[in-house]
């Protein structure tokens, strides 16, 4: 029989691994994990309400509902905030629900795309995750985390492709968590005036230090998502995606989802 310390470590490691995947999806370009360099236009806004989640062997975690707000504060730059209600449903233990970690960020496009040439759009989107969730209940990391990505995008008629990645600072005191990398790339097509469909593939290095009690928690993950964006009109949009892991799926990503509604203005 495992000791209480071992059991606590296992629960923490599972939560850390799943939270890392969820955080990656939350800070992405909805409904995907991969983001783009394009900010909200100056003095415009985006407001999302959404649910995201990931299931692994022995746990399902996610956010429902969560709220995301982006505002074009300056030309080529937007501010960003996500405030989620988070759930954790581990096998053999009580489910938890409450306030999750708060995300703040600023996206800045420093190279604009040459529509008629080869130059892509390039931007950065640094993020910080504040520990507003209760880590003891599996609802947050329990410490400050930060992400520093670079994103690139190019369009060709009805096709758009973008991707990139960056480095997550993820080491908390007295935890086995460690810094890691995330990379992703996406291809999307505007099928009709109202409907866009896309697919992405992504890779994330291990979020837990090697030498942990259970080696399963130290595994990297590679996965994919298929998604769609439907525009009801210029202000109202439906976003959804689903996917799974291709590498170490039982321990990192058996199934993941995003379902959201977006309102844009003015």
What does each model-identified segment do?
Residues 1-31, 266:
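Cleavable N-terminal export/targeting peptides
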């Amino acid at each position: 029989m495992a000791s209480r310390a071992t059991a606590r470590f296992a629960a923490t490691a599972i939560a850390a691994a799943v939270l890392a995947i969820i955080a990656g999806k939350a800070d992405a370009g909805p409904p995907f994990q991969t983001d783009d360099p394009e900010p909200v236009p100056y003095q415009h806004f985006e407001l999302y309400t959404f649910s995201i989640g990931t299931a692994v062997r022995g746990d399902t975690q996610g956010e429902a509902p969560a709220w995301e707000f982006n505002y074009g504060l300056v030309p080529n730059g937007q501010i960003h905030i996500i405030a989620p209600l988070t759930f954790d449903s581990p096998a053999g233990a009580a489910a938890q629900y409450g306030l999750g970690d708060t995300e703040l960020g600023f996206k800045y496009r420093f190279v604009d795309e040459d529509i008629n040439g080869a130059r892509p759009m390039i931007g950065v989107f640094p993020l910080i995750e504040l520990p507003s969730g209760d880590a003891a209940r599996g609802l947050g990391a329990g410490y400050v985390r930060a992400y520093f990505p670079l994103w690139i995008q190019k369009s060709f008629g009805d096709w758009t492709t973008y991707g990139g990645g960056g480095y997550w600072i993820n080491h908390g005191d007295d935890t086995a968590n460690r810094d890691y990398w995330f990379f992703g790339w996406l291809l999307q097509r505007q099928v009709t005036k109202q409907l866009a469909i896309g697919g992405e593939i992504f890779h994330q290095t291990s979020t837990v230090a090697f030498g942990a009690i259970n080696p399963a928690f130290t595994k990297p993950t590679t996965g994919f998502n298929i998604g769609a964006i439907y525009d009801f009109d210029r202000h109202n949009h439906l976003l959804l995606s689903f996917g799974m892991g291709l590498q170490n799926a039982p321990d990192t990503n058996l199934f993941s989802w995003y379902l959201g509604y977006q309102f844009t203005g003015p």
